[in-house]
A protein has these predicted regions:
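Transmembrane beta-strands of outer-membrane beta-barrel pores
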Residues: 10-14, 39-41, 48-54, 98-104, ...
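Long, well-ordered mid-to-C-terminal structural blocks that present hydrophobic/aromatic surfaces
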Residues: 38-124
Length: 204
């Protein structure tokens, strides 16, 4: 049966400072809440995040401009959904995600709007029982609008990444997964970065 759930989280980056404390206008605060509805075979969810007073972060899943914003507050929304078929085989499970964020009082020439998205497909028991396959593609968090309309190094924001894999189940304790991946090079216009990897798993 479908169920409904809600969760929330609050963090004060300067909460340990006695002159600032929690829930204060001078604090660098982070608030996250998520609402979801669904069952083990499907689900939809929406999350809202708010960062105040220039509270920034470091992370890998973004472009340089998507991270290096400068403003007072940041508000973002994330939408997610997944669906799994009742039977395994040719029909894949599907996952989709979309994020968007806006910066309040962004500095001139800095990003004031950002987005990210992804699509993922997964197959269980594809071709042979026990084997799996997956395909995913999307764009990392990237700037879509700059205050004043100025945008430098546009290729850094026009990013696209993808990956694909197939898992061979050798026996109950051993599996081999070759995978390939690629994406646009954020350091050079018109260049791409491609690669491959082979993962061997042993289970005892």
């Amino acid at each position: 049966d479908a169920r409904f759930a809600i969760s929330a989280n609050y963090t004060g980056k300067k909460g340990a400072d006695a002159s600032v404390g929690l829930l204060n206008d001078d604090n660098q605060e982070f608030f996250l809440t998520k609402v979801e509805y669904g069952s083990p075979s499907w689900q939809v969810s929406a999350a809202f995040a708010s960062k105040t007073n220039g509270n920034t972060y470091d992370g890998y899943y973004h472009t340089s401009e998507g991270k290096d914003y400068s403003g007072k507050d940041l508000a973002s929304i994330g939408l997610r959904a997944y669906w799994k078929p009742q039977e395994t085989g040719v029909v894949p499970s599907v996952q989709v995600g979309f994020d968007m964020a806006s910066v309040d009082e962004a500095a001139d020439t800095n990003p004031d709007e950002m987005q990210a998205w992804m699509v993922g497909l997964g197959w269980n028991d594809l071709l042979i029982d026990g084997n799996k396959a997956g395909l995913a593609f999307g764009q990392r968090q990237h700037a879509t609008s700059f205050k004043g309309g100025t945008k430098t190094k546009a290729y850094e924001e026009d990013n696209f990444v993808w990956e694909a894999y197939y898992t061979f189940k050798i026996n109950d304790g051993v599996s081999v997964t070759p995978a390939i991946f690629g994406g646009e090079d954020l350091e050079a216009d018109g260049h791409e970065v491609d690669g491959g990897v082979i993962l061997t798993e042993f289970r005892f």
